[in-house]
């Protein structure tokens, strides 16, 4: 019998089952194929959300370049750039509306070479259609704090010319999304002057970002150059947060993301929620932007290894968001985005100056990397100058298609500019790989140099030069620690040591050459047979000990005999030319014009003055430290105390857990500790052979150089040199191994500090990538009111050329030999950070502490650094000339090659002095020749740079002229074509720069002083202040080898 209500229940169940079946039928009907509408374009009057797919692919960081490309060593990081490019191209070919941007040509060229002709043609079509866009287009995404502008230009040129040759296109957008702060030179020189329309990046100070969000000033018109002003301005897009998409819209295949589920048959159907989330996130972006366009960066580090995981989701987003209609979503690129911004006719805020220093939050200033891994930074800078000289010589003799060339060094240097390479922020094994690449490239370039010099000097060949009769021995890359076998050898029989010095600058130069020798009875002659004044300086123990350890560590050899002396002499070398010097055993009858230096170990006076020339320095005999500098010619005179200190690295404190590491500089308080007590250590004589004499201050005097040797602590030593014909002091420092303790002393950051009596009102000046100088004000930012939470680290700035302070009477200038950090923490002070050793990781991704060691067998020690900085004092307004000219000499030292041969035999078969230019011509003192490189078909890339800013010097901040006929006097010039900075397009064919409305300004473009067009008959190039001009020069090919003037 049926219970009451049972029939009613059965009827209800039937209805429910029926409804469920009906729902299932409808679900099946809605779960079929969907053609997604991805063809969206900009819609006027609507909020347009530009989706820009990208993959940020570091050219080395946690893995080496090759490991990142092929996808090996994935236990460290799952990343394979080959997979990214393979996968992206496949995805782009599936839908003509999809787009993608790629930046790093060091990776793309590797991939390109592996592709079939058919695949290459597919990619060319993708580029032509705008689906694949190259952004930046350099060899790497260069750093902006630790790179020299010449390196930045070179690596960009390398990538841009590849893109032009293979795709006949030119990048339009700078894509500097990850560097840790942004320089004014990157904006105006590697942006506007390249012909780019915009620059895009993520990292700015957290305080600056919040203010810009509130003011809707994340997008600005940036004028990075005071001299070039609005003529080199560029539209700048600062991202809302990082360079990834908004939260919830990240779709890498290996990530745990929620996919867009538009099939109602499946659990998790979420299209309505996804569209709402998209619209809401878009409005958040719109609320901090001007106009009706916002950009979403759809990608992150090494993303798109399975590109469909991204594109499938973005296809759905675009389709359903646009069906919803509240906002418009579209595939886009930075160029399309900026085109839309430009058409919108909005008025934009103005930005000047730069974006340094960068802090991503309170107590976390990214100013440590300005100095991290100083040995790598020096190697990069030294090889940069060498690369410039090697390419000049390669051009002078003509490229040897089958022999060694400079390509490998250019490739290694291009990679080294990456923002985790020269910065010193990669893992140790990756840093080792960077160094190895540089060393291999340098070795091949050295073969080019030796062969080219031998060829140029050889009198025999009339046409080309196949195999020169002479062979130079290995050049001496470890000369700074006195290791140079060519100069140390006992001269055999009637042979002399032949030293050929090449000058890559366009000016005559006089330099002091120092070589290690063992023989005290040598004579030096120049190419004219004149016996030169020279000076012997006894070899110091610090250098000898360095030599013993590092030749064993680097070369695997035990140097039994250490050289006893430095032989020092004055060398005059013509511009773009060479001179030969003959070091021979002196005859018993004649004078060798050589003076042995006098060594004074314990001065009896209260003070000791040194200086064989106009610049004098006064040292305290009691403390052993510098007290005063003055120039007897100019009258500039300051009191100055110089010492070495260390900051204790912070290991986290009550304020914040942030520690000091490879990226972050965070000292444990504001106190810097002297490396010794108030006085310099009393130590055993600094020189070999002087027994155990104790002294605080040890003086070397001679006709060419005076030196002061100081030992500040067992691990910090210094030599100060004053030259007879130079008006600056050279400080050679030796720092390390840095000892660290436990607990709160687990890291030390070493500085040198100069304390003067100058009144500087918080102001100091630092260079931007070796180019412009920018005014800095302590505890101040030009764009916002700074909340000071790190008074030391927050006042450090990057240096590539140097810094200076000034008051009403004088300027004190310091130039550096590598990228480093500098500051003026108190009025009248300059400090440079020279070395760092931190024992904790700073939680920015590298997951290693900054501890560099060098091992011999099983004995390891912390890395010792040796380097130089250069100091000058001048009357106010007169220091610019010294900074510019000396800066060029530091960047481009004399290139030296060695051989052993009979002097007369050498003279008979070789041109001992030669000039590539007209022998009566030099470049103007305000012009630098920064590129002279043979391209294909004998064409030559020529790049000239004006060295001065407007108003920097009364004589040199003017139009300067270069006569190309005299520069290339040995060849007949057929045609001169002015190019863009990266030589990827003719200057006259560059598209007109975008015009922008700027707040508070009428539309009146500035007219900086620039050079005019090159007259085809006179071939004279004009350059205005801060102008760089690039040309491709063609010659009539009558002779392969350059005609040279002989001295």
From Swiss-Prot:
Cofactor note: Binds 1 zinc ion per subunit.
Primary localisation category: other
GO cellular component: vacuole
EC numbers for this chain: 3.2.1.24
Catalyzed reactions per annotation: Hydrolysis of terminal, non-reducing alpha-D-mannose residues in alpha-D-mannosides
InterPro entries named in the record: Gal_mutarotase_sf_dom (IPR011013), GH38_C (IPR041147), Glyco_hydro/deAcase_b/a-brl (IPR011330), Glyco_hydro_38_C (IPR011682), Glyco_hydro_38_cen (IPR015341), Glyco_hydro_38_cen_sf (IPR037094), Glyco_hydro_38_N (IPR000602), Glyco_hydro_38_N_sf (IPR027291)
Intrachain disulfide bonds: 455-465, 476-484, 855-860
Top-level taxon in the UniProt lineage: Eukaryota
Oligomer and partners: Homodimer.
Family per record: Belongs to the glycosyl hydrolase 38 family.
Name of this protein: Probable alpha-mannosidase At5g66150
Species: Arabidopsis thaliana
Lineage: Eukaryota, Viridiplantae, Streptophyta, Embryophyta, Tracheophyta
């Amino acid at each position: 019998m049926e219970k009451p209500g049972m029939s009613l229940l059965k009827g209800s169940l039937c209805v429910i089952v029926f409804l469920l079946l009906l729902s299932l039928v409808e679900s099946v009907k809605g779960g079929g194929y969907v053609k997604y509408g991805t063809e969206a374009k900009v819609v006027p009057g609507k909020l347009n959300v530009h989706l820009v797919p990208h993959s940020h692919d570091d050219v080395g960081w946690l893995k080496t370049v090759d490991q990142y490309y092929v996808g090996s060593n994935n236990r460290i990081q799952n990343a394979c750039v080959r997979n990214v490019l393979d996968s992206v191209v496949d995805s782009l070919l599936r839908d003509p509306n999809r787009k993608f941007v790629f930046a790093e040509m060091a990776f793309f060229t590797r991939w390109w070479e592996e592709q079939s002709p058919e695949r290459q043609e597919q990619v060319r079509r993708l580029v032509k259609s705008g689906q694949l866009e190259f952004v930046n287009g350099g060899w790497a995404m260069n750093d902006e704090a630790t790179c020299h502008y010449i390196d930045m230009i070179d690596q960009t040129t390398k990538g841009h010319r590849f893109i032009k040759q293979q795709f006949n296109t030119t990048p339009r957008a700078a894509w500097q999304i990850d560097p840790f702060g942004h320089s004014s030179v990157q904006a105006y020189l590697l942006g506007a002057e390249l012909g780019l329309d915009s620059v895009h990046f993520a990292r700015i100070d957290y305080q600056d970002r919040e203010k810009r969000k509130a003011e809707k000033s994340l997008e600005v018109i940036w004028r990075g150059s005071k001299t070039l002003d609005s003529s080199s301005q560029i539209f700048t897009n600062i991202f809302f947060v990082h360079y990834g998409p908004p939260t919830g819209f990240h779709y890498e295949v290996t990530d745990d993301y929620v996919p867009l589920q538009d099939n109602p048959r499946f659990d998790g159907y979420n299209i309505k929620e996804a569209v709402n989330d998209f619209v809401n996130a878009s409005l958040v972006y719109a609320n901090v932007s001007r106009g009706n366009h916002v950009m979403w960066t759809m990608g992150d580090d090494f993303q798109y290894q399975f590109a469909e995981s991204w594109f499938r989701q973005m296809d759905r987003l675009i389709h359903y968001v646009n069906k919803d209609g509240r906002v418009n979503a579209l595939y886009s690129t930075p160029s399309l985005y900026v085109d839309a911004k430009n058409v919108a006719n909005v008025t934009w805020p103005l930005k000047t100056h730069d974006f340094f220093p960068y802090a991503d939050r309170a107590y976390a200033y990214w100013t440590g990397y300005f100095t991290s891994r100083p040995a790598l930074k020096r190697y990069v800078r030294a090889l940069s100058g060498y690369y410039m000289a090697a390419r000049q010589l390669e051009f002078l003799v003509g490229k040897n298609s089958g022999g060694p060339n400079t390509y490998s060094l250019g490739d290694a240097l291009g990679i080294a500019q990456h923002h985790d390479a020269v910065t010193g922020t990669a893992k140790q094994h990756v840093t080792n790989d960077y160094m190895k690449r540089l060393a291999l490239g340098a070795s091949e370039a050295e073969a080019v140099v030796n062969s080219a010099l031998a060829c140029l000097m050889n009198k025999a060949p009339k046409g080309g030069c196949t195999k020169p009769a002479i062979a130079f021995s290995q050049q001496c890359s470890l000369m700074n620690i006195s290791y140079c076998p060519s100069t140390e050898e006992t001269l055999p029989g009637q042979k002399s040591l032949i030293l050929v010095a090449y000058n890559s600058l366009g000016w005559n130069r006089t330099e002091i050459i120092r070589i290690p020798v063992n023989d005290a009875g040598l004579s030096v002659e120049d190419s004219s047979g004149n016996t030169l004044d020279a000076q012997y300086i006894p070899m110091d123990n610090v250098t000898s000990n360095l030599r013993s350890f590092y030749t064993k560590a680097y070369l695997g050899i035990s140097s039994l005999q250490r050289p006893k002396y430095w032989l020092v002499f004055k060398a005059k070398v013509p511009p773009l030319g060479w001179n030969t010097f003959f070091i021979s055993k002196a005859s018993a009858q004649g004078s060798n014009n050589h003076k042995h230096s006098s060594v004074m170990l314990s001065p009896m006076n209260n003070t000791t003055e040194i200086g064989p020339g106009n610049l004098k320095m006064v040292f305290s005999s009691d403390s052993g430290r510098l007290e005063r500098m003055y120039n007897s010619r100019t009258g500039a005179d300051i009191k100055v105390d110089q010492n070495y200190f260390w900051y204790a690295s912070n290991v986290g404190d009550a304020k914040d857990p942030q520690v000091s590491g490879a990226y972050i500089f965070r000292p444990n308080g504001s106190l810097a500790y002297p490396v010794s007590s108030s006085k310099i250590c009393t130590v055993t004589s600094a020189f070999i052979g002087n027994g155990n004499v104790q002294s605080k201050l040890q003086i070397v005097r001679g006709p060419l150089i005076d030196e002061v040797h100081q030992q500040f602590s067992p691990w910090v030593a210094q030599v100060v040199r004053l030259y007879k014909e130079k008006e600056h002091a050279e400080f050679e420092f030796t720092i390390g191994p840095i000892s660290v303790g436990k607990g709160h002393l687990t890291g030390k950051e070493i500085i040198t500090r100069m304390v003067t009596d100058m009144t500087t009102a918080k102001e100091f000046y630092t260079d931007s990538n070796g180019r412009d100088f920018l005014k800095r004000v302590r505890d101040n930012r030009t764009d916002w009111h700074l909340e000071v939470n790190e008074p030391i680290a927050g006042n450090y700035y990057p240096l590539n050329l140097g810094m200076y302070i000034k008051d009403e009477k004088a300027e004190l200038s310091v130039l550096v030999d590598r990228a480093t950090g500098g500051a003026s923490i108190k009025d009248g002070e300059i400090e440079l950070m020279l070395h760092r050793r931190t024992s904790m990781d700073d939680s920015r991704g590298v997951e290693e502490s900054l501890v560099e060691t060098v091992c011999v067998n099983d004995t390891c020690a912390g890395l010792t650094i040796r380097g130089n900085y250069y100091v000058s004092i001048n009357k106010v307004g007169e220091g610019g000339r010294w900074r510019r000219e000396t800066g060029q000499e530091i960047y481009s030292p004399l290139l030296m090659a060695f051989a052993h041969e009979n002097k007369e035999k050498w003279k008979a078969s070789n041109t001992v002095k030669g000039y590539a230019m007209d022998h009566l011509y030099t470049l103007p003192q305000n012009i630098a020749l920064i590129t002279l490189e043979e391209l294909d078909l004998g064409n030559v890339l020529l790049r000239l740079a004006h060295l001065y800013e407007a108003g920097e010097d009364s004589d040199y901040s003017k139009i300067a002229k270069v006569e190309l006929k005299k520069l290339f006097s040995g060849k007949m010039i057929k045609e001169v074509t002015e190019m863009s900075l990266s030589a990827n397009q003719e200057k006259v064919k560059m598209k007109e720069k975008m015009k922008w409305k700027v707040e508070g300004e009428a539309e009146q473009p500035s007219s900086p002083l620039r050079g005019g067009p090159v007259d085809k008959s006179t071939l004279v190039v004009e350059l205005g202040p801060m102008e760089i001009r690039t040309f491709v020069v063609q010659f009539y090919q009558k002779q392969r080898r350059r005609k040279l003037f002989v001295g």
